[in-house]
Amino acid sequence: MLLLDLMSSPSPQLLVAAAQQTLGMGKRRSPPQAICLHLAGEVLAVARGLKPAVLYDCNCAGASELQSYLEELKGLGFLTFGLHILEIGENSLIVSPEHVCQHLEQVLLGTIAFVDVSSCQRHPSVCSLDQLQDLKALVAEIITHLQGLQRDLSLAVSYSRLHSSDWNLCTVFGILLGYPVPYTFHLNQGDDNCLALTPLRVFTARISWLLGQPPILLYSFSVPESLFPGLRDILNTWEKDLRTRFRTQNDFADLSISSEIVTLPAVAL
């Protein structure tokens, strides 16, 4: 099993220190060691094109702290090219502008489907991006925004902000995180959805990284089991593409993709 060569890469101790010194300052509690190492693995996965973005939700550290964190990683020789901090609302995502633009351009070509889980429906239903014209325009807007940034990647870690007062952040984040079947719903009906007590097929993708450490959770998303047969082709294409991209890198090993069916009394999106 080929795992990270610790002789040519930063030690786990240095990766933990980089996170705790930059993301745990002031009143913020420093992330635990396991969280620090997992975050570093996710960031490396973004840099290597295995996922378009990572949503930072470890504590209340903001964009400036994340910039400092990524600068620390780069100073350790951990990142080979600049990443970008994209702030949407009160949320910060770490993205590779090149990779996320490629992903969003594929989204505009109809490579993913959406599941409408609006509370006004008795059951979830599949819809395409062409049925969600406002969302389609939003994806195009994000592409234009990120393409403008790519002209100035001389900065080690760049930062920008998108205004999102009327966005469905659940759907936008699902797209940016690379889910093949994001959930969507009508914002004027609140955050309720029709997924309660609905059997869901939960997909997880994991990769091995540091020897002796748990695998990195690369993806975790679900689709209603009743819609799975009609979504199988899209999910198979997503898996094939991920495996292809995985074979182009040598930082991670043992890509594992699995699924299980769960039923929950309520589902928060």
Swiss-Prot record:
InterPro entries: DUF4504. It comes from the Eukaryota. Coiled coil: none annotated. It holds the Pfam family DUF4504. Belongs to the UPF0739 family. This is UPF0739 protein C1orf74. It comes from Homo sapiens (Human). The gene is C1orf74.
